[in-house]
Curated annotation (Swiss-Prot):
Protein name: Olfactory receptor 4X2
Source organism per UniProt: Homo sapiens (Human)
Compartments where located: Cell membrane
Gene encoding the protein: OR4X2
Membrane topology of this protein: Multi-pass membrane protein
PROSITE patterns for the chain: G_PROTEIN_RECEP_F1_2
Amino acid sequence: MTEFIFLVLSPNQEVQRVCFVIFLFLYTAIVLGNFLIVLTVMTSRSLGSPMYFFLSYLSFMEICYSSATAPKLISDLLAERKVISWWGCMAQLFFLHFFGGTEIFLLTVMAYDHYVAICKPLSYTTIMNWQVCTVLVGIAWVGGFMHSFAQILLIFHLLFCGPNVINHYFCDLVPLLKLACSDTFLIGLLIVANGGTLSVISFGVLLASYMVILLHLRTWSSEGWCKALSTCGSHFAVVILFFGPCVFNSLRPSTTLPIDKMVAVFYTVITAILNPVIYSLRNAEMRKAMKRLWIRTLRLNEK
């Protein structure tokens, strides 16, 4: 097996051209929107807290995560043959799970940061010092790498000697398992256990952290409630949008479903574009910092 053929979103050529314009616009918005958040955090002194440090890494992860699939999809929508080499498929699969796994760990780290900020405010700067923040980000990277490496290692044990048509627009685990001509039962269980355990346990830890935060907020005033919920609301919205499809994929049956491609579009493209929208619209400090960055840029252009 030297290559795989993708079945993109629609066989209709006109629909593919429309999808090309839509996904090109969405991917451009993902890169520009998330890069704007990274640039704003890096250049704004008012956004020097660990929360924004983690947010800048999350935005960078969103760019990388969507870049694992979106550019190939966009180019395939105009190509006659939607093909990818075997090694290209493995690389796409690795980076998709590497960046996706890293993002899951990073979202969990951000939940811990919110927990410390709300439940232990007096010790926040001591607990969440820059050395700890750097280590936590490093753990997220290592965790994502180990998750992806395990998935790829399992795929390498499969034999592909028959059909090479993938009923998807990128290399994903379930479609590849269906093409294997060797026994996939045990490997399939290990793949589901690896990805499912990461998604479900991380989501459970996130929910538990927010339950503890809500219990802690019972003694706060209404003003404190509003401030705390404003701090956590954006992160919780991103968590729900990201983990919803992940949990669905982990708990769904192994059969191919008609909505699989739409769900994949949601967790590879839509969530990445919603991240800058959610954080810029709900966070007053971020909006002010972006405004100051825009004013500084205009002044530099005038000079």
